[in-house]
Amino acid sequence: MRVLVGGGTGFIGTALVQLLKARGHEVTLVSRKPGPDRITWEELASSGLPPCDAAVNLAGQNILNPLRRWNEAFQKEVLDSRLETTQMLATTISKAPQPPKTWILVTGVAYYQPSLTAEYDEDSPGGDFDFFSNLVTKWEAAGKLPGDSTRQVVVRSGVVLGRGGGAISQMLLPFRLGLGGPIGSGHQFFPWIHISDLVGILAHSLEARHVHGVLNGVAPAPTTTNAQFAKALGAALGRPAFIPLPSAVVQAVFGRERAIMLLEGQKVVPRRTLATGYQYSYPKLEDALKDAVA
């Protein structure tokens, strides 16, 4: 299978490309920089979609970059990096003489409203209560194709755990020093997924023709709280993890609106993901963290 991957040079993209190549697929990246087996976004816009059997978009500016202030300029960057790349791929797919058979977009569980009681599956409502839920709604709308000639899949990802990037890379130093702990109250749900399972779900969605619609890209461990995650990460490192990070500090670093992503959470279940027949490699948090910090 020839697969076109937008944003394929990041943490998730690198893992996906490795898995697809290991399974015998050909991969072309769409990125800002030219290179072997790559096209640029400018080339995609001017020349259209290269011949491919499937397309995946992973592109998007890191929202939780602590070095960037949460102001209008950065919010626009966060929006544009997702909407413009998604819209460009969707447009070139719809205009292609021979469109790909499959189109996969990775968004986020921020679509669902944070709650200490509600449980969300792929059919649950959401998408209209704050900046991030509205972002996911616009993002998924930008990727929607007319008609049904191309099979469409949306994977709403949780926090991605794995070696060499993602959430773990930002947390390791304080936890290794024994200074880690829950964020805020620690009671908020923490929807997570191991990198191997997220890219596994993407590969499964590419290869299994019966898969379509929205899938929740989270582990089947929906009751994990932030405090439980912190305790498990400390245990994986052999370090204590009981020093909480106060809400006020999180809000000071990330801004009040962006801090919601860390101080609040959702109980998300992968009901449809499991129903597709996908089998998780890391369904348990302890095993996922042991691998991620190895």
Regions found by a protein language model. Name each.
Residues 3-23:
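N-terminal Rossmann NAD(P)H-binding glycine-rich loop of SDR-like oxidoreductase domains
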Residues 35-88:
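NAD(P)H-binding glycine-rich loop region in Rossmannoid oxidoreductase-like domains
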Residues 87-129:
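Conserved Rossmann-fold NAD(P)-dependent oxidoreductase catalytic core, especially the SDR/UDP-sugar
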Residues 128-152:
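Active-site Tyr-X1-5-Lys
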Residues 130, 147, 154, 158-189, ...:
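NAD(P)-dependent short-chain dehydrogenase/reductase
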Residues 172-180, 188-223:
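Alpha-helical substrate-binding/gating segment
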Residues 260-294:
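C-terminal amphipathic/interface module of NAD(P)-dependent oxidoreductases
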Residues 2, 208-256, 290-294:
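Mid/C-terminal beta-alpha module of Rossmann-like enzyme folds, strongest
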